[in-house]
């Protein structure tokens, strides 16, 4: 089976999220290829992301000349502003015709790991990872152009993709509720994985703490500064703990500055929370060390389609405090997670104080999670993807 993987929209400047997911899945494909061939379609802009796959057996990195990419994007934006799905569809099909024809000619199936299809008239079976439809649940987190873009591109993708991958049962049911054109048979629930060996291999955390000037014991929240990540409830809970008891629980934040950055960083400064350390984007090896040295991972997100940081923490031997949202509840059937209502600051306060003071519970939870997270491997996920691709081929 020849699989074309459309990686053209992966942003090399973005750390984590879909990039971590794509890298893990590609490594899984490399390990379980079993004769299948993978064509990675990249651009001059992002080809560096796939350097390690250039000389892998069963892989071919195809770099497209994208000198007209910015022009194409501009034309697509104009088409979106027409508010017409039909115009956007025909525009995309025309602009990306050459790319589509190449994939149709060279591959048996086309897989897109980045939320929506680039064009909507592929002659080959298409499989899509839509990841989430957060805009439906939290439209307030999106500008009106972004909401418009998602409405049109996701709607067209829902109608034209042949099969879908969902990272959780919640995501599958969410897609079925909001896209009546999709049937349950078209969606395969394939959990995301974690490269356990990478997160379990010890890192020199002493030099790491020295370089970043962080304390020996801290909470870790590795997430881009987006509104749905819900940084404020964690910061406000920590400030209340300080106000009530004088206890200052150190927190380390990593991730790029996005829609909530000014509010988050402004609050830290205004409240004189010098025990909160914002490191920005950090190299992957440093992130592994931060996980391994953390007392707890804290993930207060309001909405997620998956729980990659939870899996990474489990692999690193770090216990987890996380919001009580459906994907985390699904993971809690296998892992020991300390869940809380992400809208209940007082519940989080109590949980933080209790767990911070009970180191024995943390050790027990970490051992349990590190033992059980091995069932979430990218190799296992890759096998399930290949089974989905074969289903799509049989159904054509």
Named regions from a protein language model:
Residues 1-396:
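Carbohydrate transferase catalytic cores enriched for Leloir-type hexosyltransferases
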């Amino acid at each position: 089976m020849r699989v074309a993987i459309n990686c053209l929209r992966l942003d090399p400047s973005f750390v984590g999220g879909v990039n971590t997911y794509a890298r893990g899945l590609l490594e899984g494909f490399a390990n379980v290829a079993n004769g299948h061939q993978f064509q990675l379609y990249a651009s001059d802009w992002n080809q560096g992301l796939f350097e390690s796959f250039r000389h892998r057996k069963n892989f071919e990195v195809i770099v497209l000349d994208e000198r007209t990419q910015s022009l194409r994007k501009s034309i697509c934006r104009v088409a979106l502003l027409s508010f017409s799905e039909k115009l956007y569809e025909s525009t995309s099909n025309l602009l990306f015709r050459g790319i589509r024809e190449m994939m149709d000619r060279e591959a048996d199936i086309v897989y897109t790991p980045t939320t929506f299809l680039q064009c909507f008239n592929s002659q080959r079976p298409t499989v899509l990872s839509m990841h989430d439809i957060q805009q439906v649940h939290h439209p307030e987190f999106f500008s009106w152009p972004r909401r418009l873009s998602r409405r049109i591109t996701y709607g067209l993708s829902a109608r034209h993709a042949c099969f879908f991958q969902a990272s959780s049962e919640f995501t599958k049911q969410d897609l079925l509720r909001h896209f009546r054109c999709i049937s349950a048979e078209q969606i395969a629930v394939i959990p995301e994985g974690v490269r356990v060996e990478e997160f379990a291999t010890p890192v020199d955390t002493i030099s790491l703490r020295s370089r970043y000037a962080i304390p020996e014991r801290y909470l870790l929240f590795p997430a881009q500064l987006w509104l749905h990540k819900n940084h404020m409830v964690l910061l406000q809970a920590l400030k209340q703990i300080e106000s009530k008891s004088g206890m200052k629980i150190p927190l380390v934040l990593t991730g790029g500055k996005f829609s909530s950055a000014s509010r988050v960083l402004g609050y830290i400064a205004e409240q004189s929370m010098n025990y909160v350390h914002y490191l920005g984007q950090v190299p992957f090896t440093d992130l592994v060390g931060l996980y391994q040295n953390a007392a707890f991972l804290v993930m207060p997100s309001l909405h997620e389609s998956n729980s990659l940081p939870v899996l990474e923490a489990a692999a690193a031997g770090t216990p987890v405090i996380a919001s009580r949202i459906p994907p985390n509840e699904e993971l809690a059937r296998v892992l020991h997670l300390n869940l809380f209502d992400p809208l209940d600051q007082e519940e989080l306060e109590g949980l933080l104080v209790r767990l911070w003071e009970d180191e024995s519970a943390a050790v027990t939870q970490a051992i349990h999670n590190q033992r059980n997270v091995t069932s979430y491997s990218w190799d296992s996920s890759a096998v399930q993807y290949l089974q989905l691709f074969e289903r799509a081929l049989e159904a054509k």
